[in-house]
Swiss-Prot record:
HAMAP family registered for this protein in UniProt: Urease_gamma
GO MF, one annotated term: urease activity
NCBIfam families linked: PRK13241.1, urease_gam
Protein's name according to its UniProt entry: Urease subunit gamma
Superkingdom assignment: Bacteria
Keyword terms: Cytoplasm, Hydrolase
Keyword Cytoplasm appears in the UniProt entry: yes
Signal peptide start and end residues: none
Swiss-Prot/TrEMBL catalytic activity: urea + 2 H2O + H(+) = hydrogencarbonate + 2 NH4(+)
């Protein structure tokens, strides 16, 4: 199987997000890379499901709370940006202050 660099990056995000999701379910607080991967993967899946950019920008602030992550992580993540594939093409989704 041959994957492009973009496909490899998406796959890496999904794998990291899966690890983060399992840790979150066990009550383990997520670190910075895990939190970013978790939010990014949720945004990518929402786009594939047909949600709008505006919906994802709003929902993206609800995926994780301060209780889900290690101390200091919310302050480290001011924005999460992802080029997500929507039914009508690829668009940039930006979520400001995603962890509240």
């Amino acid at each position: 199987m041959h994957l492009t660099a973009r496909e490899q990056e998406k796959l890496l995000i999904v794998v990291a997000a899966d690890v983060a999701r399992r840790r979150k379910e066990r009550g383990v607080k997520l670190n910075h890379p895990e939190a970013v991967a978790y939010i990014t993967a949720e945004l990518m899946e929402g786009a594939r499901d047909g949600k709008t950019v505006a919906e994802l920008m709003s929902e993206g602030q609800q995926y994780l709370t301060r209780d889900d992550v290690m101390e200091g992580v919310p302050e480290m993540i001011s924005d999460v940006q992802v080029e997500a594939t929507f039914p009508d093409g690829t668009k940039l989704v930006t979520v400001h202050n995603p962890i509240r």
